Amino acid sequence: MSKLDLGPAGVALTVSDTYLGQAAELERLGYSALWLPGGQIDDLDRLTEIIRATTAVPVASAIISLDVYPASSVADLYARLEAGAPGRLVTGLGGPQRPHPLLALNGYLDQLDRAEPPVPAQRRLLAALGLRKLELARDRCAGAIMLLVTPAYTSAARQILGGDSTLVIDQMLVLDADATRARETARRPLRFLSGLPGYRASFARMRFTDRDIDGLSDALVDQLVPWGDAGTIATRIGEYRRAGADHIVLHVLNDGGQPGPMEVARELAGGLLAGSPSAAP
């Protein structure tokens, strides 16, 4: 299977009154993919709206939950968009939060394979943290999306995926050099995610202790969520690329006073997109 080329960096959008205009600006800035987080996908046609608001950039879900949308709905979305905007939709899939998740995932992928037209493996990515989901991402999708991992764990995932699969890092970050403030912003989503069995197990595999996980220690926060000025964040992103990531999603966290996604995207664009064919002249 040929690798899915998403370019160097994309941005996670937040649905708002202005998000379609933001999508168009991000494409003009040269970002090579646009991402809609699962919590923002209250309707699959949000992805359609982003594609219509832009001209050529790939638009990806991160992720469509198997617990929320049946395979038939994803297949219908793909068929509609492939007819009108071929090659632009990337289906990032995740879950399910139920017993025997691998069995459910394989069944869901089987349905996408049998759809008319099928949603091809080359246009599917799978949220994966553990060994078996990474293997499934390698064998039945174009690759994996990973959230809240270290560069060392990224390197280990690359070894499992091999060289022909795409590895996307959904990178939470905070553009703020104040350590106390930045860490508190980072801890807000971590308080919820650290309570989910899959993330807790993933943190343990990265050798974080129960005390680190329960208390969301500075060490855990600092290793999983880059924060600081633009140069510091760009350096941290470079570590993930050197570890084997193909594409970085800027998933910007802020407390309302810190820079938001568009401010961060504008500030980081020059360094992250240098040399990218999609970069604006």
Segments (PLM) and residue ranges:
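Active-site-adjacent structural elements that line small-molecule/cofactor binding pockets in enzymes
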Residues: M1-P281
